[in-house]
Amino acid sequence: CARLLALLDMDADQSRYAERTVAEIEREQGITYAPMQRQAVALAAKAGVMLLTGGPGTGKTTTVRGIVALFQKMGLSIVLAAPTGRAAKRMSELTGMEAQTIHRLLGTTWNETAHQVTFQKTEKEPLEAEAVIVDEMSMVDVALFSALLRALRPGTRLVLVGDADQLPSVGAGNVFSDLIRSRKIETVFLREVFRQAERSAIIRNAH
């Protein structure tokens, strides 16, 4: 997709900033990231588009919180979204930020005359967000993902999160797995499973 490729530009100058900022976030949140979690948060500072995948208990939520904190430090306006109301509610509870369904984000309505779904947010009226994080990407089909891409301004940072091994979306296309297999987009694989008591990160004494 040309619109996705247009978002892929990376800012190599952000590397040092990212390392320093990730260390700040660890101190502020009182945690020490596992190596791949740290890599993911740092990558978000410079990647136009990135994929974050991992199974249950691998620390995706902790990593997403770190990415949100990073974007906040960068002064970016952030939108959190998920394909279902349940997933959006869970995302909101775990990050402490409002999250909404992708359909609501795009202003989805049903056009009775055309007998098709229409979206308020498009190239002509794009989203204001400078960074968009989408969770449960394995549940997103081709049509919805294409609509989301059309609604993004050039230069918007896009973070796609999910479990590539999860059952694919009901609609057409296994978007998330296909993006990972393409090897065209920076991808971080979280494989280490943390104990629940660790809350998906290595908790340390912050004092």
Question: Where are each of the predicted segments found?
Answer:
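Conserved ATP-binding/catalytic motifs of P-loop helicase motor domains
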Residues: 1-207
